Amino acid sequence: YDGKSFDATRRALLQLGLLSMGHLGAVFGGAGEVDPVSHLVATAVGWGGLPRTEASYFSAGPLPGDADKPHELILSDVPTNAFWSITLYNQRGFMVPNGTLSVNALNNVNATPRDDGSYRIQLGGCNAKIANCIPTPKGWNYLLRAYQPSESILLGDWQPPKAMPIEMLTE
């Protein structure tokens, strides 16, 4: 086992995964159901994936130069037959301890909806008074999972909104 070679290979695959920054497509499932290269990249990013009919994965992160700014993501009517979740990861693809809030993920079960039923998720700039806030580690990115996705996700008709820096939303 060559740990240095393993780490270098995983870092390269993580970079490829970050370049995809979008719907990860058919990356988990049986032989003949997945794209082999996408599967290789996806297993470096997240080893425990489900077939497309059980979960769809959307990766995203801040634009260059915006990583230190708090971001906002508004989710409404995510077309799933089960639930959705958002998980934040560091630059190495891991969840990390993040202080007193101890939050790395939110979903439509544990997040607080707004009056209109949508969810405002804040990424970074957190304190105990901000609802639905996930602290952002250095080099952060996030993954939106849609469990038991509806046909609109499976056909590619629905795409999630991107998190935007909060300052851009208030200008």
Regions found by a protein language model. Give the residues of each.
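A compositional/structural signature for long, glycine/proline-rich flexible linkers
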Residues: 1-171
